[in-house]
Amino acid sequence: MLKSIRLNLIPLTAQQLETGLQSIKQLSMELNIPIIADLMSGVAAETITKKLAIMHDLPPELHPWCTYWLMVDICDNLAMGLVGFKGAPDADGSVEIGYGVNSIYQGRGYMTEGVGALLEWAFSHAECRQVTAFTLPANIASRKVLVKNGFREISSAGEEIQYRRTRD
C-alpha cells in the first residue's frame, strides 16, 4: 500500500480485480472499504479484463506494474478512483500510466495526488526510467494532472496527446 496526504493506494490482486468485475459489493466487503458503485464499470471494466490477461502471464512480483491501485480517500474511507500502469517497464525503462476518478471527486486534486504517489513508487525502481501517458486534447483535467506531475507534451499526432515524465 502507498500513502499520500489524503489517499491510500492499494494494489489490487488479480483475484480482487476479478471479484470487482463480478460484484463491486463483494470486493467492498472483502477489503472492508466502501467503493463507489460504478468504479469498475464501462471503460474501467474493459481495461481490467486486459490487465487480467497480462497478469495471468507474468510472475506475481510484476503484478503491481499491471494492476489497478485503488484510490481510497483517508478521511471518508471511500474508494473513488483507480490508477495504474499498463505493464512492467519495457527494455527502454518506459511504462504507460492510466487513471480515473469518480466525477464527484473530480476537480479536488485527488487524481493529481494519486498519480504523484504512483510516480514516486515507479521511480523508486531502477528499471523504470520514464512514464508516458496519452490523453485527448479536450480532456483538460487529465492534461492538468499530467502537467502538475511534471509531464511534458512530446507529441500531438492523431487524436491523442502524448506526455512523458522522466526520472529526475
PLM regions with names:
Residues 109-112:
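Glycine-rich acyl-CoA binding loop
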Residues 146:
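Conserved active-site tyrosine of GNAT-family acetyltransferases
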Residues 1-96, 101-104, 117-121, 125, ...:
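GNAT-family acyltransferases
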Residues 133-143:
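Conserved beta-strand-loop-alpha-helix junction that forms the acyl-donor binding cleft
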